[in-house]
Regions:
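Positively charged, low-complexity terminal tracts
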Residues: 1-87
């Protein structure tokens, strides 16, 4: 697993460059943590069901209560990889 992110510096989206992070801290209530866990479980199920065709999902798209929060995105590391027939 890798974690990427960027600081909210008010830059236009085309000027934003993600960086690999060594640590993240979630400042969240117990209810928010449970909703995030549900989102992560849903992402895992989507990846299992759709394989390489499942690209990514935004938490705020699945749970509108996170619309004003920092962007939380899960990305499939196998997305777009060609099937080699050896799997």
């Amino acid at each position: 697993m890798k974690i990427f992110g960027y600081a909210d510096e008010g830059l236009p989206v085309e000027a934003v460059v993600s960086a690999e992070l060594a640590e993240i801290t979630l400042v969240a209530s117990t209810d928010e943590l449970r909703r995030i866990a549900k989102f992560l479980e849903s992402c895992a199920e989507g990846m299992e069901a759709r394989g390489r065709s499942w690209e990514h999902e935004h938490l705020s798209d699945k749970d509108r209560s996170f619309e004003g929060s920092a962007h939380f995105v899960v990305f499939n590391p196998e997305w777009g990889q060609r099937y080699t027939g050896s799997e």
